Amino acid sequence: MRTLWRLIASFFKWTWRILNFIRKLALNAIFLVLVLVCIGIWSQFSSTTSEHAARGALLLDITGVVVDKPSASSKLGVIGRQLFGASSDRLQENSLFDIVQTIRQAKDDRNITGIVLDLKNFVGGDQPSMQYIGKALREFRDSGKPVYAVGSSYSQGQYYLASFANKIWLSPQGEVDLHGFATNGLYYKSLLDKLKVSTHVFRVGTYKSAVEPFIRDDMSPAAREADSRWIGELWQNYLNTIAANRQITAQQLFPGAQGIIDGLRKVGGDTAKYALDNKLVDELATSTEVEKALTKQFGWSKADNNYRAISYYDYNVKTLSDQGSAIAVIFANGAIMDGEETPGNVGGDTTAAQIRDARLDPKIKAIVLRVNSPGGSVTASEIIREELAAAKAAGKPVVVSMGGMAASGGYWISTPADYIVANPSTLTGSIGIFGVINTVENTLGSIGVHTDGVATSPLADVSSTKALPPEVQQLMQLSIENGYQRFITLVANARKSTPEKIDQIAQGHVWTGEDAKANGLVDSLGDFDDAVAKAAELAKLKTWHLNYYQEEPTFFSMMLDSLTGSVRASLPAAIQAWLPAPVAAAAETVKAESDKLAAFNDPQNRYAFCLTCANIR
């Protein structure tokens, strides 16, 4: 018996020792990683000089997507990449303004003698963002320094940036994949019918198509007509820019589906030769041949065993002066939600607080609101608008810079501005409001579950498990109609028009920036630089600096966001890994749609949101 007890005691003793060893090992490993990260952060950010020892190229090796305002986890991903060459399945976000600032600094850096665009890991960005980067690349070229693009193949987004280069190399086995733009969404009516879900839709606006997925299985003719117009304009703008850069015609660049098929047939299906023959690229070359050419241009680095170049992620950008008068830059990037900001979304309370801080700061002389949003909560949009109006009333000029989209609620928050600058390819307008309430009384009834009770008023008897009372439906529709009238009145007052005239161009209609200028919804066409210059002009500033209002996350908050985000990202990825490719693709689409719906948290269930704007690809 004693032997048995000794064996049991020995088992628990060794088990504890093993667990304790693992615990200590894990804690020490975490501590070591934290020390290395802190050292790396200090070494990366303590230096403010942009000079590096050897002359060479700036390697613009952008990984992931370009956005106005990257999330905290993306910033941590950049640090991890710099320190350990770490990679992640999560899509890395890169700041548009950091990229442009880097290119402009490199233009004046005597040690940077050119730029190499290596875009194999670049996913893309909205068209106005790409144009802004292209503008910086053109300025770099105009300074007398060359820009080269290298790639085994080019997607549409990659090729757009590559077109700004002096020379484009393409692999002999590669292609330039031009196919056009599309906007697609899921429609749920048949599914909801099969599930016996009762859908109650409240909306104002002929073209307010955000509710169509709940009540149709396809696009309405009005939505198809409107979307065909603006997506065609975006595609034409895309072609015109590249054609001008390549000094060819838009027809030569993209002769249509049949034209491409006929052209490929002439060269036996050789996509690389087709690209060369049609002047889409300048030369077909293997990676070895490209390396030789770049080595001849920039020299050889023994340390890197490659041509001399410094990665965009390793290039130290000088800290700009923060002395004197400032122009505040506040971001409204993503769907507008009620409450605090979450990654990828605009928090009504968070953004309003930033505007208030800028209003009360005596050093801030003007505000530029950078809007890149399809809209969202009406309540949150109004909270932001009111605070922006207060800043304007306090005597601080307010200028709105519209990015890829400033539609619906994104336009609502723009109305107090003294001046609105949009890109020709901005998607804006979509002036309309909707609400959707789904109830599942029939679904539950089909399996024998019913809801019953008493209430002092039909207005109190609201539940997703019961039929929506007619009185509540009437109140909802009245609320939506009131919200729409308020929306067009705000626009009319801001644009010095009348509600009747605004109603003619509203009704949920999406406009490109070019059309919005013609309709009087924006003041001028331009980019972020133009908006800043206008703000300085209105504030009568001769010198100024920009103060970007974005909360810098702590290291631990970045770690937490990264870990939770990785879990959120890895679960769907793990599930999709077991699915056939077509099913996995559909699952990813469903997830993207559900993420959009998750941002709908308006307390009054009223939304000014442009669904099609967020679906373009």
Segment roles from a protein language model:
Residues 446, 540, 545-550, 610, ...:
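C-terminal recognition in membrane/secretory proteostasis and scaffolding
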Residues 23-42:
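Hydrophobic membrane-insertion alpha-helices, especially the h-region
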Residues 38-54:
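Aromatic-capped interface at the extracytoplasmic side
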Residues 185, 189-293, 441-539, 580:
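Charged, glycine-interspersed solvent-exposed loop segments at helix/strand-loop junctions
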Residues 1-22:
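N-terminal Lys/Arg-rich, disordered targeting/topogenic segments
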Residues 2, 322-357, 361-363, 551-617:
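Intrinsic disorder and flexible/low-complexity segments
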Residues 245, 263, 282-326, 434, ...:
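C-terminal long alpha-helix characteristic of the crotonase
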